[in-house]
Design a protein with these regions (language model features):
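Positively charged, low-complexity intrinsically disordered leader regions
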Residues: 1-20
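Conserved strand-loop elements at the edges of beta-sheets that form or border functional pockets
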Residues: 8, 26, 74
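Conserved N-terminal subdomain of the carbohydrate kinase-like
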Residues: 14-19, 23, 41-122
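Short glycine/serine/threonine-rich phosphate/pyrophosphate-binding segments
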Residues: 28-29, 79
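Histidine-anchored nucleotide/phosphate-binding helix
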Residues: 29-38
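Flexible loop residues that form catalytic
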Residues: 125
Length: 127
């Protein structure tokens, strides 16, 4: 494995599609990390999830893509979620909650972790 090139910092959530009774790992930063990795660039993800089923879903999705998650923190509480409706193929975001991400902030160890990357990308929802 090559050394990681870029670290993606920020939001994650589970997208809930009640009409289809489906759940997907998502969020701007998670989606970006997956896209970067699928384009052949080694990357890491820095964020926070709850210790619930949805947090496990996010972790599993990132690990499945072989994204470095050593600074993905898990905290007591619920992972962020978004309810999404589909209307003729268009997504309509109707409700969301940040949950454990509300109070999340970088720690000293996070900054040390970031030193090993050539690039850092953060989303508007990175706190």
């Amino acid at each position: 494995m090559n050394p990681p090139e870029i670290c993606i910092i920020g939001d994650n959530c589970v997208d809930l599609y009640p009409q289809q009774e489906k759940k997907y790992a998502g969020g701007n930063a998670v989606n970006t990390a997956v896209a970067v990795k699928r384009n052949g660039i080694e990357c890491g993800y820095l964020g926070i999830v709850g210790n619930d089923e949805n947090g496990k879903r996010i972790i599993d999705a990132l690990q499945k893509e072989a994204i470095d998650c050593q600074r993905l923190r898990q905290q007591e509480g619920n992972t962020a979620w978004t309810k999404v409706l589909l209307d003729e193929g268009d997504r309509i975001f109707i409700e969301d909650s940040l949950e454990v991400q509300k109070e999340w902030d970088l720690e000293e160890q996070d900054y040390l972790y970031l030193d090993k990357f050539n690039w850092v990308h953060h989303t508007i929802f990175s706190n």
